[in-house]
């Protein structure tokens, strides 16, 4: 399994995603450093991905939300405490507690700093496990502010029964590509695990339908 996860890092480098780097760099820390916006998007990237939003799906959803709702969206990636290391995939929760706590803290920050914002969220690969761990234990008042969550290549899909525990299924959409074995409870990485850029438009539409 370690070989399979190491293969993910190599495949990610070999399969770059075209993104606006300047826009992504600005967008990745907006909850912490910027003003409140009507919509706050919180995202956890996959293992070995750079920056706060990663490269596979986070920047795409962030930018699509901003294009659909100009001047109304703040994007926040989970980090820097969450380092998206490979080894944490082997832990019981599919990530480490530091990452889960940091993500939970960002949801709580959005709720306290911006009480009128509508929160949407997402995660890719290990980042999906981060979202499972963080959202399931949030106070109910904070959970109620989360209007929609999209998860790509969810490493906790099988273990948690295709849902985020203790969170409404109608506010969650999990994307599992055909042939992506991590969705079946393994850590075997196939090419399908890198295909989720294709789901960004649908995921964005889902989140917008909830706000």
Curated annotation (Swiss-Prot):
Residues 1-18 form the signal peptide. Disulfide bonds join 36-114, 62-75, 176-183. The active site is at residues 125, 180, 193. One of its GO terms (biological process) is carbohydrate catabolic process. It comes from the Eukaryota. It catalyses: cutin + H2O = cutin monomers. One of its GO terms (cellular component) is extracellular region. Catalyzes the hydrolysis of complex carboxylic polyesters found in the cell wall of plants. Degrades cutin, a macromolecule that forms the structure of the plant cuticle. SUPFAM superfamilies: alpha/beta-Hydrolases. It comes from Neosartorya fischeri (strain ATCC 1020 / DSM 3700 / CBS 544.65 / FGSC A1164 / JCM 1740 / NRRL 181 / WB 181). This is Probable cutinase 1. Belongs to the cutinase family. Glycans are attached at residue 202. GO terms for molecular function: cutinase activity. Keywords: Disulfide bond, Glycoprotein, Hydrolase, Secreted, Serine esterase, Signal. The record marks 47, 126 as: Transition state stabilizer. It is found in: Secreted. Pfam families: Cutinase. Gene3D superfamilies: alpha/beta hydrolase (3.40.50.1820). Its EC number is 3.1.1.74.
